[in-house]
Amino acid sequence: MPLLDSFKVDHTKMQAPAVRIAKTMTTPKGDLITVFDLRFCVPNKEIMSPKGIHTLEHLFAGFMRAHLNSDEVEIIDISPMGCRTGFYMSLIGAPSERRVADAWLAAMHDILNVQDQSKIPELNIYQCGTYTEHSLSDAHATAQHVITRGIGINKNEELLLDESLLTE
Protein backbone atom coordinates (compact mmCIF):
# COMPACT_ATOMS: atom_id res chain seq x y z
CA MET A 1 0.00 0.00 0.00
CA PRO A 2 1.40 3.45 -0.86
CA LEU A 3 2.52 5.68 2.00
CA LEU A 4 0.07 8.55 2.56
CA ASP A 5 1.37 12.12 2.67
CA SER A 6 0.32 12.53 6.31
CA PHE A 7 2.79 9.83 7.32
CA LYS A 8 5.74 11.53 5.60
CA VAL A 9 5.99 14.29 8.21
CA ASP A 10 7.75 13.92 11.56
CA HIS A 11 5.03 14.03 14.20
CA THR A 12 7.65 14.52 16.95
CA LYS A 13 8.45 17.96 15.50
CA MET A 14 4.87 19.20 15.06
CA GLN A 15 3.80 22.25 17.01
CA ALA A 16 0.24 22.59 18.23
CA PRO A 17 -2.06 24.33 17.88
CA ALA A 18 -0.86 24.96 14.34
CA VAL A 19 -1.95 25.10 10.71
CA ARG A 20 -0.14 23.13 7.99
CA ILE A 21 -0.84 22.86 4.28
CA ALA A 22 -1.03 19.08 4.00
CA LYS A 23 -1.66 18.87 0.27
CA THR A 24 -2.66 20.84 -2.80
CA MET A 25 -4.12 19.48 -6.02
CA THR A 26 -5.75 20.81 -9.15
CA THR A 27 -8.94 19.26 -10.50
CA PRO A 28 -9.29 18.40 -14.21
CA LYS A 29 -11.36 21.61 -14.58
CA GLY A 30 -8.59 23.70 -13.03
CA ASP A 31 -9.93 24.27 -9.51
CA LEU A 32 -7.29 24.35 -6.79
CA ILE A 33 -8.03 22.15 -3.77
CA THR A 34 -6.04 22.68 -0.57
CA VAL A 35 -6.05 20.28 2.37
CA PHE A 36 -5.07 21.77 5.72
CA ASP A 37 -3.88 19.93 8.83
CA LEU A 38 -5.40 21.83 11.76
CA ARG A 39 -3.40 20.37 14.63
CA PHE A 40 -5.09 21.08 17.97
CA CYS A 41 -2.89 18.82 20.14
CA VAL A 42 0.79 17.90 20.22
CA PRO A 43 0.98 14.39 18.70
CA ASN A 44 1.66 11.59 21.18
CA LYS A 45 1.46 14.01 24.12
CA GLU A 46 -2.09 15.38 24.06
CA ILE A 47 -5.41 14.08 22.77
CA MET A 48 -8.99 15.30 22.50
CA SER A 49 -11.69 13.25 24.20
CA PRO A 50 -14.02 11.28 21.90
CA LYS A 51 -17.08 13.22 23.08
CA GLY A 52 -15.28 16.56 22.87
CA ILE A 53 -13.96 16.03 19.35
CA HIS A 54 -17.42 14.90 18.25
CA THR A 55 -18.98 18.08 19.62
CA LEU A 56 -16.23 20.15 17.99
CA GLU A 57 -16.98 18.41 14.70
CA HIS A 58 -20.60 19.61 14.86
CA LEU A 59 -19.66 23.20 15.81
CA PHE A 60 -16.31 23.83 14.12
CA ALA A 61 -17.39 23.18 10.52
CA GLY A 62 -20.15 25.78 10.57
CA PHE A 63 -18.13 28.41 12.38
CA MET A 64 -15.13 27.95 10.06
CA ARG A 65 -17.38 28.37 7.03
CA ALA A 66 -18.75 31.60 8.51
CA HIS A 67 -15.23 33.00 8.96
CA LEU A 68 -13.37 31.60 5.93
CA ASN A 69 -15.74 31.07 3.00
CA SER A 70 -15.64 33.87 0.42
CA ASP A 71 -15.66 34.41 -3.33
CA GLU A 72 -12.20 32.76 -3.47
CA VAL A 73 -12.57 30.05 -0.81
CA GLU A 74 -15.19 27.39 -0.19
CA ILE A 75 -14.77 24.73 2.48
CA ILE A 76 -15.61 21.25 1.20
CA ASP A 77 -15.24 19.31 4.45
CA ILE A 78 -13.74 19.42 7.93
CA SER A 79 -13.18 16.01 9.50
CA PRO A 80 -11.56 14.85 12.73
CA MET A 81 -8.32 12.89 12.55
CA GLY A 82 -8.49 9.32 13.76
CA CYS A 83 -5.63 10.05 16.20
CA ARG A 84 -7.83 12.75 17.81
CA THR A 85 -5.11 15.41 17.67
CA GLY A 86 -6.75 17.61 15.06
CA PHE A 87 -8.92 18.01 11.98
CA TYR A 88 -8.35 17.93 8.24
CA MET A 89 -10.00 20.70 6.27
CA SER A 90 -10.40 20.40 2.49
CA LEU A 91 -11.37 23.47 0.51
CA ILE A 92 -11.51 25.02 -2.92
CA GLY A 93 -8.98 27.84 -3.08
CA ALA A 94 -5.66 28.67 -1.46
CA PRO A 95 -6.02 30.90 1.60
CA SER A 96 -2.83 31.64 3.51
CA GLU A 97 -2.05 29.71 6.67
CA ARG A 98 -2.43 32.96 8.65
CA ARG A 99 -5.92 33.55 7.21
CA VAL A 100 -6.89 30.00 8.17
CA ALA A 101 -5.40 30.47 11.66
CA ASP A 102 -7.37 33.70 12.14
CA ALA A 103 -10.62 31.97 11.09
CA TRP A 104 -9.82 29.04 13.40
CA LEU A 105 -9.23 31.37 16.35
CA ALA A 106 -12.52 33.18 15.68
CA ALA A 107 -14.30 29.79 15.49
CA MET A 108 -12.88 28.83 18.90
CA HIS A 109 -14.33 32.03 20.39
CA ASP A 110 -17.67 31.15 18.76
CA ILE A 111 -17.55 27.69 20.35
CA LEU A 112 -17.02 29.22 23.79
CA ASN A 113 -20.16 31.29 23.20
CA VAL A 114 -22.30 28.15 22.80
CA GLN A 115 -23.64 27.84 26.34
CA ASP A 116 -26.08 24.96 26.11
CA GLN A 117 -25.77 21.46 24.66
CA SER A 118 -29.20 21.92 23.03
CA LYS A 119 -27.61 24.59 20.79
CA ILE A 120 -25.25 22.08 19.12
CA PRO A 121 -26.30 21.77 15.45
CA GLU A 122 -27.67 18.45 14.18
CA LEU A 123 -27.64 16.96 17.69
CA ASN A 124 -30.50 14.50 17.27
CA ILE A 125 -31.14 10.86 16.43
CA TYR A 126 -31.98 11.68 12.79
CA GLN A 127 -28.88 13.71 11.87
CA CYS A 128 -26.12 12.23 14.04
CA GLY A 129 -24.87 8.65 14.19
CA THR A 130 -24.06 8.82 17.91
CA TYR A 131 -26.09 11.78 19.11
CA THR A 132 -25.67 10.85 22.80
CA GLU A 133 -21.86 10.96 22.55
CA HIS A 134 -21.17 14.68 23.02
CA SER A 135 -19.54 16.95 25.59
CA LEU A 136 -19.87 20.70 25.32
CA SER A 137 -17.59 21.13 28.34
CA ASP A 138 -14.83 19.10 26.63
CA ALA A 139 -15.30 21.15 23.44
CA HIS A 140 -15.05 24.34 25.52
CA ALA A 141 -11.84 23.09 27.16
CA THR A 142 -10.30 22.39 23.75
CA ALA A 143 -11.37 25.78 22.39
CA GLN A 144 -9.87 27.52 25.43
CA HIS A 145 -6.67 25.47 25.00
CA VAL A 146 -6.32 26.78 21.42
CA ILE A 147 -7.08 30.38 22.40
CA THR A 148 -4.64 30.32 25.33
CA ARG A 149 -1.76 28.84 23.35
CA GLY A 150 -2.38 30.68 20.10
CA ILE A 151 -2.13 29.16 16.64
CA GLY A 152 1.19 28.75 14.87
CA ILE A 153 2.18 27.48 11.44
CA ASN A 154 3.83 24.13 10.73
CA LYS A 155 5.89 24.05 7.52
CA ASN A 156 6.29 20.78 5.62
CA GLU A 157 9.96 21.40 4.87
CA GLU A 158 10.65 21.63 8.62
CA LEU A 159 8.70 18.43 9.35
CA LEU A 160 9.94 16.21 6.53
CA LEU A 161 10.56 12.75 7.93
CA ASP A 162 14.01 11.31 7.25
CA GLU A 163 13.68 8.57 4.61
CA SER A 164 15.45 6.10 6.90
CA LEU A 165 12.45 6.35 9.26
CA LEU A 166 9.79 5.75 6.59
CA THR A 167 8.02 2.39 6.82
CA GLU A 168 5.01 1.22 4.86
Swiss-Prot record:
What the protein does comes down to: Involved in the synthesis of autoinducer 2 (AI-2) which is secreted by bacteria and is used to communicate both the cell density and the metabolic potential of the environment. The regulation of gene expression in response to changes in cell density is called quorum sensing. Catalyzes the transformation of S-ribosylhomocysteine (RHC) to homocysteine (HC) and 4,5-dihydroxy-2,3-pentadione (DPD).
The entry lists its GO molecular-function terms as:
iron ion binding; S-ribosylhomocysteine lyase activity
NCBIfam families the UniProt entry points to: PRK02260.1-2 (NF002602)
What keyword terms does UniProt attach to this protein? Autoinducer synthesis, Iron, Lyase, Metal-binding, Quorum sensing
Q: Which gene encodes it?
A: luxS
Record's family?
Answer: Belongs to the LuxS family.
Q: Name one Pfam family in it.
A: LuxS
GO biological process: one example:
quorum sensing
Per the entry, the cofactor note is: Binds 1 Fe cation per subunit.
The UniProt record lists the keyword Metal-binding: yes
Q: State the species of origin.
A: Actinobacillus succinogenes (strain ATCC 55618 / DSM 22257 / CCUG 43843 / 130Z)
Tell me what this protein is called: S-ribosylhomocysteine lyase
Q: Which cofactor does it need?
A: Fe cation
Please give the PANTHER family that the UniProt record associates with this protein.
S-RIBOSYLHOMOCYSTEINE LYASE
The lineage's top-level taxon is Bacteria
